[in-house]
């Protein structure tokens, strides 16, 4: 019979998996407590980094309906539960992994889709949501400005033609 503490912990993990926009699984073997705390600070509120027992995590991912994560839960595992921008969190994890070879990104899940370690790295290479939205807005603005110029050109030509006709009539 499971202990009440473990039942509660599985329920909390299930809730975190279900409510997070993304979750990135890592192997932290060889990292000191100070380095883990440094990683938590680097995530800067975009994600909550938690060291988890694999048996409890497997129960939680089953309960959350994310069974595709089970094969990644081997060896010393920790999970970054992303609440904010997944791109920022992936960048923070990638940068920390580059600086500390002991951190290995195993993979993750984003909005219900399983991500390999390479896909998490590709996510980290994306620009943030704000930058992408600014680029879309800039492109839309350029198209609208070009369209406005096209609509204004015939009006300007008509005005020049009317002025030329008026000048010609004034001469005659």
UniProtKB/Swiss-Prot annotation:
Transmembrane segments: none annotated. The keyword Secreted does not apply. One of its GO terms (cellular component) is large ribosomal subunit. CDD domains: Ribosomal_L10. GO terms for molecular function: large ribosomal subunit rRNA binding; structural constituent of ribosome. Belongs to the universal ribosomal protein uL10 family. Part of the ribosomal stalk of the 50S ribosomal subunit. The N-terminus interacts with L11 and the large rRNA to form the base of the stalk. The C-terminus forms an elongated spine to which L12 dimers bind in a sequential fashion forming a multimeric L10(L12)X complex. This is Large ribosomal subunit protein uL10. It comes from Acidothermus cellulolyticus (strain ATCC 43068 / DSM 8971 / 11B).
